[in-house]
Swiss-Prot record:
PANTHER family: 60S RIBOSOMAL PROTEIN L12, LARGE RIBOSOMAL SUBUNIT PROTEIN UL11M. Transmembrane segments: none annotated. InterPro entries: Ribosomal_uL11, Ribosomal_uL11_bac-typ, Ribosomal_uL11_C, Ribosomal_uL11_C_sf, Ribosomal_uL11_N, Ribosomal_uL11_N_sf. Keywords: Methylation, Ribonucleoprotein, Ribosomal protein, RNA-binding, rRNA-binding. It comes from the Bacteria. One or more lysine residues are methylated. The keyword Ligase does not apply. This is Large ribosomal subunit protein uL11. Forms part of the ribosomal stalk which helps the ribosome interact with GTP-bound translation factors. GO terms for biological process: translation.
């Protein structure tokens, strides 16, 4: 018989830098999960990613206090900011442009994000990422 699921916890944790301090500790502690066990497993799984890159993770907590987790790809906005070399997006994206990204950068980001996107092709994924870039106030060069 399958284990009974108690909770799903969604967090964004910096790759390779999970520790028991907030937000990880309180979120896992209230469900009785061994926090250090999660931190060690998460850090081991994300060691090949760039350290400090925010990584979404979905933790499934079972009734016997065991857990499994799935890491996702970093948010498109973080990857776009890194590609454009900016600190934050524009407060007024339609009037105030803060940077530029080209097609090659969009394709690179789309390749990274492809497992988490519902796009059927790379071209559709690039268009999705380009829309995110425009909404952040970035110029998109074709």
């Amino acid at each position: 018989m399958a284990k009974k699921v108690n909770a799903y916890i969604k967090l964004q944790v910096k790759a390779g830098q999970a520790n028991p301090s907030p937000p990880v500790g309180p979120a896992l502690g209230q469900h009785g999960v061994n926090i250090m066990e999660f931190c060690k497993a998460f850090n081991a799984k994300t060691q090949n990613l760039e350290p400090g890159l925010p990584t979404p993770v979905v933790i499934t907590v079972y009734s016997d206090r065991s857990f499994t987790f799935i890491t996702k790809t970093p948010p498109a906005s973080v990857l776009l900011r890194k590609a454009a070399g900016i600190k934050s997006g524009s407060g007024r994206p339609n009037t105030e442009k803060v940077g530029t990204v080209n097609r090659a950068q969009l394709e690179e980001i789309a390749n990274v994000k492809m497992p988490d996107l519902s796009a059927g092709s790379l071209d559709a994924a690039v268009r999705t990422i380009a829309g995110t870039a425009r909404s952040m106030g970035l110029n998109v060069e074709e």
